[in-house]
Amino acid sequence: MIDNNILVKGNKEGINIVININKFKDFEEMLEALVKRLSVGKMFYKGCNLKIITDLKNINEKQSVRLKQVLFEKFLIKDCIFEDSNEKPSKIFSGIYEGRTKFLRKTIRGGQVVNYPGNIVIIGDVNAGSEIYVGGNIVVFGALRGYAHAGFGGNSKAIVAAISLEPEMLQIADLVTRSPDNMKPQYPEVAKIRGNIIIVEPYLPNKFI
């Protein structure tokens, strides 16, 4: 389950982490919860710019330095800044950032990891043993056989679509499913969340997804 006191949202600058620090008994409890939350998809944060949005009056300078150190060492982030949640309404990314989409014209081979905060379109196959972590949608013009995590950070409106949808594991937000064994799709399919489960439907060009 996702801790609602720590929200992770992608935007065009990087990743926002919104922490309701008043819900934790102390800094140590918050830090432990944050590390646990981010460890779900650790490689997603490598090389990312992070913005920590929280009530800064509850974090002293020594604690902020320690927090940064943990993020740099454990998650290999590129940069980390702080924003006081009480100063102004934070510009949090909600839903899918439709204007930011990355196109990859290649096969993603086993052992490769792809991280992106927006949507990603892959023109080629995603082989078994590969991993994809994105903040928005995943669309594959080929076979998707690796691990795919769309809506990373809790975006339950994200979708995963492929010409041949047969992933080792598929995750949207915090929900996870697997492909049925020995079931090769006969048509393009779309996976999305409906209610509290991931459903897979045939792709219909004229149907809104």
UniProtKB/Swiss-Prot annotation:
User: Which Pfam families does the UniProt record give?
Assistant: MinC_C (PF03775), MinC_N_1 (PF22642)
**Endpoints of the signal sequence:** none
Q: Does the keyword Metal-binding apply?
A: no
Keywords from UniProt, A to Z, are: Cell cycle, Cell division, Septation
Coiled-coil regions listed in the entry: none
Can you tell which superkingdom this protein's organism belongs to? Bacteria
Q: Name one GO biological process term.
A: regulation of cell septum assembly
Q: Which InterPro entries does the record cross-reference, listed alphabetically?
A: CAP/MinC_C (IPR016098), MinC (IPR013033), MinC_C_sf (IPR036145), MinC_N_1 (IPR055219), Septum_form_inhib_MinC_C (IPR005526)
To which protein family does this belong?
Belongs to the MinC family.
The entry describes its oligomerization and partners as: Interacts with MinD and FtsZ.
Q: What does this gene product do?
A: Cell division inhibitor that blocks the formation of polar Z ring septums. Rapidly oscillates between the poles of the cell to destabilize FtsZ filaments that have formed before they mature into polar Z rings. Prevents FtsZ polymerization.
**This protein is called what?**
Probable septum site-determining protein MinC
**What organism does the UniProt record list as the source?**
Clostridium kluyveri (strain ATCC 8527 / DSM 555 / NBRC 12016 / NCIMB 10680 / K1)
